[in-house]
């Protein structure tokens, strides 16, 4: 028997830095799920001596967000460990990794939601989000399964944003972006804090209007530091004819249309 669930990508329509707390950058961002780009997480029955995770990942199992979630969840209930003696996890990967699209965080959240269901943990979305936040900053957004949300703090504060469905197309060039290096560059050469008034204005504006009225640099505070580290992260260099925005710390670009 196999059960499965889609694990969607996300884009950041805007990403603004509002301050620093305990060494972490505080952000204000609009996260939007990309409905046409997703991995599939499956639980497949069998007999296994240990937790088994299969998929085309760019890291060891012990470093994978799904494995980290398993370790957290089995501390909550013995049912989790028992379940994965009789099931393995398979992830059919489509979302590019390390691309600013939240693939690892989405996989983690999808796994948590599925385990909460199949093991009858009966944990609320808020409780699941708290667990997810200890694994990755973007995990809480995916736990809530909102199509659009305003996200703040280090990613743990997620508030649903109601807007019409959006048609989002992504493009991920074969360019590696190191998130740590990009934040270092931002801090040393591009540091600025978005005002609370500006954040409130952005949080109340529809994504399509932000896309139509802002440009790639003003929408994402991490784009210029990313570009300073890799000059090829330029829509013109990549032959992107349509107006494109930059997601997270890259390297993915995206366009938005009304659905």
Residue ranges and their predicted role:
Residues 1-99, 117-127, 148, 162-164, ...:
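ATP-binding N-lobe of GHMP and related small-molecule kinases
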Residues 10, 24-27, 66-70, 108, ...:
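A general structural signal for well-ordered alpha-helical segments in protein cores
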Residues 15, 39-43, 138-143, 149-150, ...:
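Short beta-strand scaffold segments in enzyme catalytic cores
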Residues 51, 142-244, 256-259:
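Conserved, helical-rich catalytic subdomain that frames metal- and/or nucleotide-binding sites
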Residues 90-117, 137, 243-253:
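Glycine/serine-rich anion-binding loops at beta->alpha junctions
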Residues 108, 112-153:
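Contiguous, small/hydrophobic- and glycine-enriched helical/loop subdomains that border
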